[in-house]
Each structure stands twice: as C-alpha cells, then as structure tokens.
Design a protein with these regions (language model features):
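Conserved alpha/beta-hydrolase catalytic His-Asp/Glu region
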Residues: 142-147, 161-218
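Gly/Ala-rich beta-loop-alpha elbow adjacent to hydrolase catalytic centers
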Residues: 109, 113, 117
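Catalytic histidine-centered segment of alpha/beta-hydrolase-like enzymes
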Residues: 257-270
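Conserved HGGG/HGGXW glycine-rich cap/lid loop of the alpha/beta-hydrolase fold
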Residues: 19-77
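Active-site loop/oxyanion-hole signature of alpha/beta-hydrolase fold enzymes
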Residues: 57, 66-108
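Conserved alpha/beta-hydrolase "acid-adjacent" motif
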Residues: 233-239
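Short beta-strand/loop motif that positions the catalytic acidic residue
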Residues: 220, 226-228
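Flexible "cap/lid" loop of the alpha/beta hydrolase fold
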Residues: 118, 122-123, 128-159
Length: 293
C-alpha cells in the first residue's frame, strides 16, 4: 500500500495458477459487525492496487479488504503465457484459499478487474456474495488499432512520455491529469517500472483476447453493481448500460468520469459502493431483474 497507510496492512506473495500475485490484506476491522463484508479488489490493466487508495481509506473501517495486483503488474510476478479471464478468476479463488477465507466475498473490479469479477461470479457462485463491475468492457469487440498499439506499446514504448501520457489521456479526465498528484506520478512510474514483456502479455490477454462477457451477464446470480463513466472514450456508456440491463439482479450507475471512475470521482464511486453494500443487507432490493438506480 502507500507509505501513508497503517502498518496493519499485510502484504503477501501468493502462488497461483498464473504467477505469484502480490496481495494486500487490511485485516478484520476493529469495528467488525454482522454487516461487515470481505471485499476483494482487482485493478485495471496498466495500473496496480493503488487506484483503490481512496476506497481503501473509507471502506476498511467496516470491511476487510483484499487487494490483488494482476500478473505483470505492481509487485506481482509475470505470467508464463497469455491467460483468460476465467484463469484470473481461478487465481482469485486460490488467493482466498491461501488466506483461508471461506465466507462469500464481494468482488470489486475495474476494467480488467470487472471482467475477473464477472467470471468469478459465474464459475464460483457459492463464493460470491456480490459483484461490483467498474468501467468494465464486457463486449468482445474486434481488435482495434488502438488496443493493438496499447499492447505493443506496453512492451516497446512504455518508457516514453508519449505512450504514458496517451494511456493517461484515455484513462482519466483532464481535471484529474492536471492535478499532478502523487497518484498520477505513481501511475506513470508503475508503467515505466514493471517488465515490458510481462505487461504486454497481460494487456494483450485483456484487451485483445478476452472472452465475451456481455452475453453471459444474465447468468450472474449475485447482486451486481455496474458503474460506467459518461466520458469514457474507450467504452461508450450507452453500450455498457445496454449490457448491464441483462443482469438479473443488477444496479447501473453512470458517473461523470472517464475510464477509471475510482480515480476521477473517488468520493462518488466510494459512496456508490458503500450504498450498494448497505443494500445487500436488504436482499429484496435486488429481487427485480434489471433493477436500476
């Protein structure tokens, strides 16, 4: 975690089917109650667990948070080859096994992480309390030049300002980029600091070779919050709204953000997640197929 976070956060390297994954565990909160959940958070490609810093600060008081850096990202090791989102879901399950977490969990994911969350809910329904899919590209689209460039650039151009700035332009609102915060500096350093080969392998697996999830969303049994950004130039909000309508126990929320809502609108995103967690205690709120907020 970031240097400012308490020492109570435990960092582990856990062997999975993909690689050794860096896992950050806030532990059981002092104010744990019957409503406390275990939240598992997986970030987007080209970013690590620090995109959730704002959410961790607010949610850890009442919930146990498990944050996972995907293969080739952050402090995690490289995968041995390309991988599927289902394999990522299996890796998440193996992390829970190692941590001896048996109660159903709330899986929260941004983009790549949202795909993992959806696959986890489909393959491991008994372990899934609920799902939060943030800015998640559920459609299997034809390979676009931009996606191919991002994948290739992750291997060969990641040290250049042009590549890193291009990623930032796609991910964040102009106001976020102009802040020049510690987060933005860390975001750039992360891209430049990890292995280009490992990063490119992961980016290709997610952007170019992911499976279609939109056609299977109606098979997710768990309550699901789907958040999309109005200004997401990568994945149009109307397309994601249409896909989310297939969720049988779904909530759709649109926020005035680009691709990473957790960074562009941290307070609003955290509030949406917190409200969703509160509603989990009232399961009748999700009894109607395709419920919307």
């Amino acid at each position: 975690m970031t240097p400012s976070e308490p020492d109570s956060v435990k960092t582990r390297s856990i062997l999975t089917n993909l690689s050794r994954l860096a896992v950050y565990d806030t532990g059981i909160p002092n104010r744990a109650a019957a409503s406390s959940e275990v939240l598992v958070l997986w970030p987007s490609v080209l970013a690590d667990h620090r995109i959730y810093d704002a959410q961790v600060a607010d949610l850890r008081e009442h919930h146990r948070l498990i944050l996972i850096d995907g293969p080739g990202h952050g402090a995690s090791g490289p995968s041995s080859g390309r991988f599927s989102m289902e394999q990522c879901a299996d890796a998440l399950s193996q992390v829970l096994d190692t941590l001896q977490i048996v109660k159903p969990v709330v899986v929260i994911g941004t983009s790549w992480g949202g795909l993992v969350a959806g696959e986890f809910a489909l393959k491991h329904p008994g372990r899934t309390r609920a799902v939060v899919m943030l800015n998640t590209p559920v459609f299997k689209t034809r390979a676009r030049w931009r996606d191919s460039f991002v994948s290739w650039g992750a291997r060969w151009l990641k040290f250049t300002n042009r590549y890193v700035q291009g990623v930032a332009d796609a991910y964040f609102m102009p106001e976020t980029r102009k802040r020049e915060s510690a987060f933005m500096e860390g975001f750039r350093k992360h891209i430049r600091g990890v292995s280009g080969a490992a990063l490119s392998r992961a980016v290709r697996s997610v952007l170019l070779e992911r499976e279609d999830l939109a056609s299977r969303l109606n098979s997710i049994a768990a309550p699901t919050l789907f958040v999309a950004g109005t200004h997401d130039s990568m994945y149009p909000v109307d397309d994601l709204r249409h896909a989310a309508a297939q969720l049988t126990r779904g909530r759709f929320i649109e926020l005035p953000t680009a691709h990473l809502s957790v960074v562009d609108a941290p307070s609003e995103t955290t509030q949406a997640i917190d409200s969703f967690l509160t509603e989990l205690q009232l399961t009748s709120s999700f009894s109607s197929p395709g419920a919307k907020a």
